């Protein structure tokens, strides 16, 4: 029997208690270890639920390891890898979103990278969390790198079909991604329709910058909100703290 690991169990228990969750994504390509540690400490202090580490390009090897270690040294939050490919794996993390980019046109991002990385995940003893990853317009860098056919913003049923297929394939999470730095988030109506057909937790990320957007997305059905660029683009730790607190207020 497949056992659910500690991180996934923690996520499920938090959601079952009626909470909406906030994960912060740190890209090692844009954030040096010292800053990653400071952001992680801040995240824990304001009530963020987990740290995701990864990026579309460049997040691998010693650079990735050093960022993960700095985060682990600075906070007790779960660290979940969010790899761009099979090279984005660090033995120092707690878990990995073992995800398939369902609407890629390239089989490498659907099952190829996963096959190449599977033995590394097993050897490192990382907790794999199976996840259906779906790119929504505009898709930004991740859409281009992952050779995705982004779901049109006005076609929510297409997103729902992919999400339900992911659930039926055994994925225990669905992630709707507008792309890091997207001008706007996934449309709330798309979130609502996807949530109405799936029975697994729904993550929404990309283009989320304000508490009002968070409020709208969680009201539509998002269980977990992911922010990255909104925090990375702040000019100081104090500004990052204010932004995190604003986003946290949107969850309530």
Swiss-Prot record:
GO cellular-component term (any): cytoplasm
Protein's recorded name: Geranylgeranylglyceryl phosphate synthase
EC number in record: 2.5.1.41
Keyword set, alphabetical order: Cytoplasm, Lipid biosynthesis, Lipid metabolism, Magnesium, Metal-binding, Phospholipid biosynthesis, Phospholipid metabolism, Transferase
UniProt cross-references to InterPro entries, sorted A to Z: GGGP/HepGP_synthase_sf, GGGP_HepGP_synthase, GGGP_synth, IGPS_HisA/HisF
Source organism (scientific name): Pyrococcus abyssi (strain GE5 / Orsay)
Pfam families, per database record: PcrB
Binding site for Mg(2+): 27, 56
Reactions performed catalytically: sn-glycerol 1-phosphate + (2E,6E,10E)-geranylgeranyl diphosphate = sn-3-O-(geranylgeranyl)glycerol 1-phosphate + diphosphate
Subcellular compartments: Cytoplasm
Cofactor(s) the protein requires to work: Mg(2+)
């Amino acid at each position: 029997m497949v056992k659910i690991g500690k991180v996934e169990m923690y996520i499920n228990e938090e959601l079952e208690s009626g909470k909406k969750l906030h994960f912060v994504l740190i890209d090692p390509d844009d954030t040096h270890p010292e800053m990653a540690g400071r952001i992680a400490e801040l995240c824990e202090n304001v009530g963020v639920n987990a740290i995701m580490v990864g990026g579309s390009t460049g997040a691998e090897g010693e650079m990735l390891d050093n960022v993960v270690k700095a985060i682990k040294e600075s906070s007790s939050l779960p660290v979940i890898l969010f790899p761009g490919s099979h090279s984005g794996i660090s033995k120092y993390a707690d878990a990995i979103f073992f995800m398939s980019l369902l609407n890629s046109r390239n089989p490498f991002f659907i099952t190829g990278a996963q096959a190449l990385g599977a033995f590394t995940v097993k050897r490192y003893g990382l907790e794999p969390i199976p996840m259906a990853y779906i790119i929504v317009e505009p898709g930004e860098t991740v859409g281009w790198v992952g050779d995705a056919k982004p779901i049109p913003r006005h076609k929510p049923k297409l997103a729902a079909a992919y999400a339900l297929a992911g659930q039926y394939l055994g994925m225990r999470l669905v992630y709707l991604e507008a792309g890091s730095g997207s001008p706007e988030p996934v449309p709330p109506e798309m979130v609502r329709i996807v949530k109405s057909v799936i029975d697994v937790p729904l993550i929404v990320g990309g283009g989320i910058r304000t508490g009002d957007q968070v409020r709208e997305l969680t009201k539509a059905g998002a269980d977990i909100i992911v922010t990255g660029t909104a925090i990375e683009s702040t000019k100081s730790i104090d500004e990052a703290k204010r932004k995190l607190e604003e986003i946290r207020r949107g969850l309530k």
